[in-house]
From Swiss-Prot:
This is Unknown 12C protein. It comes from Calliactis polypus (Hermit crab anemone). It comes from the Eukaryota. Residues 1-17 form the signal peptide. The keyword Ligase does not apply. Expressed in acontia, a specialised envenomation structure laden with batteries of venom-containing nematocysts found only in the superfamily Metridioidea. The keyword Ribosomal protein does not apply. It is found in: Secreted; Nematocyst. Its main location: secreted. Contains 6 disulfide bonds. Keywords: Disulfide bond, Nematocyst, Secreted, Signal, Toxin. Cysteine-rich protein with probable toxin activity.
C-alpha cells in the first residue's frame, strides 16, 4: 500500500516536471523522462530497486545512467526441469498465461523451455 502510494506520487512528480523540458542530449541516449529522474529524483532508482529488485534489469535500456548507480541483480534462472515437468500441455499453459509464451516470451522459451515449445509448435 505504501509502495503503491509512493509510486503514484513519484509518477505525478515526474509528469508535472516534464513540462518545459527540452530534449535531453548526452553521450548516452536517454529519454527526457530519464534525465528528469536523474536531476530531480536521483534516489528514485534505489527506491525502485527496493520495491522491485529487478527494476534496473528490466528498465536499464530506457535509463542507463540512472541505473548504473544501482546494483543490477540478476534474475535467477528457472530450473529446466520445471518446464519439462509442469509445461507439457501447451493449450492449458497458453490459457493460463493468456498468450502463446513461446512467441511472446521467446527469449525465456528458447533458454528454458525448448522441449515445451516444440510441443507448442506442433499444434
Amino acid at each position: 500500500m505504501m509502495s503503491a502510494l509512493f509510486l503514484v506520487l513519484s509518477v505525478s512528480l515526474l509528469v508535472s516536471g516534464l513540462q518545459g523540458i527540452g530534449e535531453a542530449t548526452s553521450e548516452i541516449k536517454e529519454s527526457p523522462l530519464c534525465s528528469l529522474m536523474e536531476e530531480r529524483l536521483p534516489d528514485l532508482c534505489e527506491v525502485q530497486v527496493k520495491i522491485d529488485p529487478h527494476y534496473c534489469q528490466d528498465h536499464f535500456s530506457s535509463c542507463p545512467r540512472t541505473c548504473l548507480r544501482c546494483k543490477r541483480p540478476q534474475k535467477p534462472p528457472a530450473p529446466p526441469r520445471e518446464c519439462k515437468d509442469l509445461r507439457t500441455d501447451c493449450p492449458r499453459a497458453m490459457h493460463s498465461y493468456g498468450m502463446d509464451i513461446c512467441r511472446e516470451m521467446s527469449s525465456y522459451a528458447s533458454m528454458y523451455c525448448k522441449s515445451y515449445c516444440k510441443l507448442c509448435n506442433k499444434r
